[in-house]
């Protein structure tokens, strides 16, 4: 929270707002499929006094809810291509599946790009910051590789 002369404000950074969206998407991955309207209504319930939602976040969730299945398909297809590339290039099999947090971070980035046309370098850098926030150093490479090709 930012401190002002008058006291506390509830200004959140864009990264903190992205983290809130990633956490929402992550929690939702366990309960898919859902209708777009239901997902958007669920997000409104995610609003808290400490972390109030804004229109910027709502547009990201709207883009996510309307494109979830096509985004998931793109992620799966790109992950398979990446694994084949590793196998061809290094002659080793990468059986590592994409984890749910990485999926949520990538879905958030794809949704933000769709909703706000945010540029690729910023989205990748923010995604890596979010992975650091959750101490997911090992998954950062995978996240970066996916976003680099999907955005």
Curated annotation (Swiss-Prot):
UniProt organism field? Mycoplasma genitalium (strain ATCC 33530 / DSM 19775 / NCTC 10195 / G37)
SUPFAM superfamilies linked to this entry: NusB-like
Name of the protein described by the UniProt record: Uncharacterized protein MG027
Output the InterPro entries linked to this UniProt entry. Answer: DUF1948 (IPR015268), NusB-like_sf (IPR035926)
Pfam families reported for this sequence: DUF1948 (PF09185)
Its lineage reads:
Bacteria, Bacillati, Mycoplasmatota, Mycoplasmoidales, Mycoplasmoidaceae
Q: Which domain of life is it from?
A: Bacteria
């Amino acid at each position: 929270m930012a401190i002002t002369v008058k006291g506390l404000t509830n200004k959140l950074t864009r990264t903190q707002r992205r983290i809130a969206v990633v956490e929402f998407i992550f929690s939702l991955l366990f309960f898919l499929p859902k209708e777009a309207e239901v997902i958007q209504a669920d997000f409104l319930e995610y609003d808290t006094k400490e972390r109030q939602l804004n229109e910027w976040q709502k547009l990201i969730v709207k883009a996510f809810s309307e494109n979830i299945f096509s985004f998931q398909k793109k992620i799966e297809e790109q992950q398979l291509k990446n694994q084949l590339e590793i196998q061809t290039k290094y002659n080793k099999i990468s059986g590592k599946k994409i984890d749910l947090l990485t999926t949520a971070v990538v879905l958030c980035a794809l949704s933000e790009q769709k909703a706000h046309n945010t540029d690729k370098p910023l989205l990748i850098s923010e995604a890596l910051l979010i992975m650091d926030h959750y101490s997911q150093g090992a998954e950062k490479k995978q996240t970066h590789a996916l976003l680099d090709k999907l955005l």
